From Swiss-Prot:
Family recorded in the similarity comment: Belongs to the DNA mismatch repair MutS family.
InterPro entries cross-referenced by the UniProt entry: DNA_mismatch_repair_MutS, DNA_mismatch_repair_MutS-lik_N, DNA_mismatch_repair_MutS/MSH, DNA_mismatch_repair_MutS_C, DNA_mismatch_repair_MutS_clamp, DNA_mismatch_repair_MutS_core, DNA_mismatch_repair_MutS_N, DNA_mismatch_repair_MutS_sf
Coiled coil: none
SMART domains reported for this sequence: MUTSac (SM00534), MUTSd (SM00533)
Protein name, UniProt field: DNA mismatch repair protein MutS
A GO CC term assigned to this protein in UniProt: cytosol
Length: 881
């Protein structure tokens, strides 16, 4: 049963259900949490969906068209856990609260006060400490695209606009880490949604075209920032960025049901400001999330930030390494100064005492702050002088401009701290409605109301004594209940002695209850004092929030400074703890790492980690790495990328020394897996990733390629791997680490720009000892059977494999004696002049081969991935014919 189907005729429903259906009509896209007393209830299709997603009981309430109305509900006091699960599942939830007073005349007034979506969360109960809630909007027009990002929980707002290249979209979105993406429902290409969902696990929300209106965007943003022009933000020539930003403002106001006073500025970014990392590279390097459930990511390893906002800033820093070496050196100077004077420890001790004020300030701005939020803010203000004292030796030395600047941005909030100390009790309740939040002595009117409320007991005792003396009835009692209010109780036998001013209120089996004008006056005063005191507390609390909102810009600056100091101190702590070194930057192309280590593997390994050197430059762009499985090839490649990444995040690095030139992108082609969702085989996935690298890598890119070509036949795979090495070296000219089991590739080591390396291993008494040391030169053998033995392959299988290996090696030797070695790899294009000759080599085929004829007919640039795979099968069939 669908609520929309029964909206046509509301007359057959109860007043409560009529009210529900009218509200639901405006929120068809959301699960409506409808407040009913101490529960949130859901009806019709919402009830079915909630019962399924939350595992709660599906029941019914009333009927519609003769059928029971499905109903499910959750307790109000524990709703946050259920809300978190629904939002995590990508659902939108509308919270409908009781806002009116119970009058007995029809249902109490209700309205939607907040809409929860994955990209608009600010409540700690709905977010983990290190999780950002990033709302991202896209605006595409012709060959341009505008991005905008809004993190309501942190007050972060930024935009960029650039040429639209579909293949670049996943890279930019992965850097922004969206929790929810907004798109124009009228203009977007369906393929874009498909591409987003392929690479990112976040909902895509279609919004009305008017939200993205280019003409209205300027006014929307000017109104938000209270300015007459956006030229100061650098947005004038960027209409699509402005349109995307305006769409975010519309959506945020709609979901929060309030203004956004903490969104006071906007930052313009350029994609060229950052090192590009596509989703595959982020996953392979395990930057934020580990590849496997019980693994450890780089973020998990290095995150020992003392504040939640510092942890979130660290996560953003790792996801978007910057290319501005002046900014990086400023960070490194700050780290160096903290390390040299052992200053990071006292700084971190103070930071540990500071709560998540970044999110507190967002809730203050949105009007959803709770009493304990202000206690957190009060305590943070109290810690600022201690934090500045801990930084003082470094600031006074004037060797770190960044720390000096951050020290100033911390500000002085002594007066605010004193104000909050006077206003809020030491340990307030969770909710304002529970009362006793405002401290005694802060407000005279509130103190008077509390006096009446709190001293009611003594008044009643005194009145009871007085009435006993007046009536001479020693058993007279004064009491109270919620139904009757205050009363004087006499037994039936004594009721005849009741004075004339006793007004009968209630008759019981054995007693009569009365009220007097004096008791009635007291009752009115006491009962109203409770509600009036709570109303006064609410007004005072709202006034506090308004006062804080007026100072929100300075408070946000303080919060941002704390987060930055926390990240810098954390990097200093990691450097000291793990013996990391300060990296150097050079304008010359290259990567030179001495004694490099993989930070995660080193930290988790029980055995000492074997450090290795990396050397790549314009004369040595390609390193072909051979050697046994488990020998450390993948670890070596990943550590090179992670060291480069950490350096460009402004951190010290796990190495004895590191010197890095410009890097615009990091690519990885590591590991193998089928993509069952799209029907792609392991080899097809491998080739798709390889194609991305060949098309988009530049001479400033760092490329890691592991076992290219292993997903197909030996000769096909070898030929492809060979061609990739040649293309990356001669045309792309990137810096590349290329691990392979194709020993034939080591022949390329004699070509300019290509060097051979191998991971060392030794055999001792038939056992393989992996030394994990990378040395120059090709590997002498693969040690495949020894690795299989280490993996626990049964002895009889190893023995059979050894027999087969000897047979194959003998056959290969016989073949080599009867063939011309120089014909194995023929130059692909004999017409190229020697100075520019490409050294791609493939298995030689006869000139009249059907396969060669078919190959000549293929238009490579126009092939889709599926067509490419079909052509491969046709080529193989032609070769076999």
């Amino acid at each position: 049963m669908n609520s929309a189907e029964i909206m046509a005729d509301l007359s057959n429903h109860t007043p409560m259900m009529q009210q529900y259906l009218k509200v639901k009509k405006d929120y068809q896209h959301a699960l409506l949490f409808y407040r009913m007393g101490d529960f949130y209830e859901l009806f019709f299709e919402d009830a079915h969906l909630a019962a399924k997603l939350l595992g709660i009981t599906l029941t019914h309430r009333g009927k519609a068209n003769g059928n029971p109305i499905p109903m499910a509900g959750v307790p109000y006091h524990s709703a946050e856990g259920y809300l978190a699960r629904l939002v995590k599942a990508g659902r939108t939830v509308a919270i409908c609260e009781q806002v009116g007073e119970v009058t007995g005349k029809g249902p109490v007034e209700r309205k939607v006060v907040r809409i929860l979506t994955p990209g608009t969360l600010t409540d700690d109960a709905l977010l983990t400490s290190y999780q950002s809630s990033n709302l991202v909007a896209l605006c595409i027009h012709q060959n341009q695209i505008g991005f905008a990002l809004l993190d309501l929980s942190a007050g972060i707002f930024k935009v960029q606009q650039q040429d639209y290249k579909p293949e670049q979209l996943p890279i930019e979105l992965a850097r922004l880490m969206p929790s929810e993406i907004l798109i124009d429902e009228d203009l977007v290409d369906p393929n874009i949604i498909e591409q987003i969902k392929k690479h990112l696990d976040c909902p895509v929300t279609k919004r009305p075209n008017v939200d993205f209106n280019l003409n209205n965007a300027q006014k929307t943003l000017c109104d938000q920032f209270s300015v007459s022009t956006l030229s100061g933000f650098g947005l004038d020539p960027l209409p699509l960025a402005k349109a995307a930003a305006a769409a975010l403002i519309h959506y945020a106001k709609e979901t929060q049901k309030t203004a956004l006073p903490h969104i006071r500025s906007i930052l313009l970014e350029q994609s060229s400001d950052f090192i590009a990392l596509d989703p595959i590279t982020r996953r392979n390097l395990e930057i934020i999330e580990p590849l496997f459930e019980h693994g450890t990511s780089l973020f998990q390893l290095v995150n020992d930030c003392q504040t939640a906002m510092g942890g979130r800033l660290l996560s953003r820093t790792l996801m978007q390494p910057v290319r501005d070496t002046a900014l990086l050196d400023a960070r490194l100077d700050a780290i160096e100064q903290l390390i040299q004077g052992y200053h990071e420890s006292p700084v971190r001790l103070v930071l540990k005492e500071i709560g998540d004020i970044e999110r507190v300030l967002s809730r203050v701005a949105l009007g959803s702050a709770r009493p304990r939020d202000l206690v957190q803010l009060r305590h943070a203000c109290a810690q600022i002088p201690f934090l500045r004292n801990a930084l003082a030796p470094v600031v006074q030395a004037k060797k770190s401009k960044l720390l000096g600047q951050l020290d100033q941005e911390l500000g002085d909030f002594k007066s605010l701290h004193q104000h909050l100390m006077a206003a809020i009790v030491e340990n307030p309740p969770v909710l304002l409605r529970d009362g006793n939040v405002i401290a005694e002595g802060y407000d005279a009117e509130l103190d008077e109301l509390r006096q009446i409320r709190d001293h009611a007991g003594q008044f009643l005792i005194d009145l009871e004594i007085k009435e006993r003396e007046r009536t001479g009835i020693s058993t007279l009692k004064i009491g109270y209940n919620r139904v009757s209010g205050y009363y004087i109780e006499l037994t039936r036998a004594q009721a005849e002695q009741a004075p004339a001013d006793y007004i009968r209120r209630q008759t019981l089996k054995n007693a009569e209850r009365y009220i007097t004008p004096e008791l009635k006056s007291f009752e009115d005063k006491v009962l109203s004092s409770e509600s009036r005191a709570l109303a006064r507390e609410k007004a005072l609390f709202e006034a506090l929030l308004e006062n804080l909102r007026e100072n929100i810009a300075h408070l946000q600056m303080m919060s941002s400074a704390i987060a930055q100091i926390d990240v810098i101190a954390n990097f200093a702590h990691q450097a000291r703890l793990n013996n990391w070194a300060r990296p150097e930057f050079t304008p010359e192309t290259g990567i030179k790492i001495q004694g490099g280590r993989h930070p995660v593997v080193e930290a988790l390994s029980k055995a000492p980690f074997t450090p290795n050197d990396t050397f790549l430059d314009v004369q040595h762009r390609m390193a072909i790495i051979t050697g046994p499985n488990m020998g450390g090839k993948s670890t070596f490649m990943r550590q090179t990328a992670l060291i480069s990444l950490l350096a460009y995040c402004g951190s010290y690095v796990p190495a004895r020394a590191a010197k890095l030139g410009p890097i615009d992108r990091i690519f990885t082609r590591i590991g193998s897996a089928d993509d069952l969702s799209t029907g792609k085989s392991t080899f097809m996935v491998e080739m798709t990733e390889t194609s991305q690298i060949l098309h988009h890598a530049t001479n400033q890119s760092l490329v890691l390629m592991d076992e290219v070509g292993r997903g197909t036949s030996t000769y096909d795979g070898l030929s492809l791997a060979w061609a990739c090495v040649v293309d990356l070296t001669k045309r792309v000219k990137c810096l590349c680490l290329f691990a392979t089991h194709y020993f034939e590739l080591t022949e390329l080591g004699s070509e300019p720009g290509i060097d051979n390396y191998h991971v060392t291993a030794q055999e001792l008494n038939g056992n393989l000892i992996l030394l994990h040391k990378v040395q120059q030169g090709p590997a002498s053998q693969s040690h495949g059977l020894q690795v299989a033995k280490l993996a626990g392959i049964p002895a009889n299988v190893i023995k059979e494999a050894q027999k087969r290996l000897r047979i194959l090696e003998k056959q290969q030797q016989q073949h080599l004696q009867t063939s011309v070695q120089s014909d194995l790899f023929a130059t692909l294009d004999s017409e190229v002049t020697p100075s520019t000759q490409v050294i791609e080599k493939v298995i030689e085929v006869e000139v009249s081969s059907p396969a060669l004829d078919l190959l000549k007919q293929i238009e490579v640039d126009n092939l889709t991935p599926r067509q490419a795979l079909e052509q491969l099968y046709e080529l193989k069939a032609a070769l076999n014919s």
